[in-house]
Amino acid sequence: MSRSLLVISRQAPWSGPSAREALDVVLAGGAFDLPIGLLFLDDGVFQLAAAQDAKAVQQKDLTANLQALSLFGIDDVFACSHSLAERGLTAPDSAQPLSSAQISQMIDRYDQVMTL
């Protein structure tokens, strides 16, 4: 049986390669039917914001990767409700908002945790 993996994405989408790398890891795991989850935390919640203009910052758009999560069978997508509120954002339907206490409990369910 495969060990479960939670990937925590803490970086804004255009602040460096970490956001893309987190999505790449999750999508690769999903392609191999691994039990995998994704948590957006801190500035990582900016990846969930609608209407981002990647061309304005000369970056590749991550929206398609986010939309592909469900196609790869990745249903465990979470967002820190405190991080969302601090940044004036709301979670899209594709991400379940969790409190700090819920995040702690959820992390305990995974065998391995990777933070990017």
Residue ranges and their predicted role:
Residues 6-20, 52-53:
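Short, glycine-rich nucleotide/cofactor-binding loops
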Residues 19-38:
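Histidine-anchored nucleotide/phosphate-binding helix
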Residues 36-42, 76-81:
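Short internal beta-strands
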Residues 44-58:
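N-terminal beta-loop-helix "entrance" segment that forms/cooperates
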Residues 55-83:
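A glycine-rich helix N-cap at a beta->alpha junction
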Residues 77, 113-114:
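Short, well-ordered beta-strand core segments
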Residues 110:
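An anion/phosphate-binding loop that grips the pyrophosphate of nucleotide cofactors and donors
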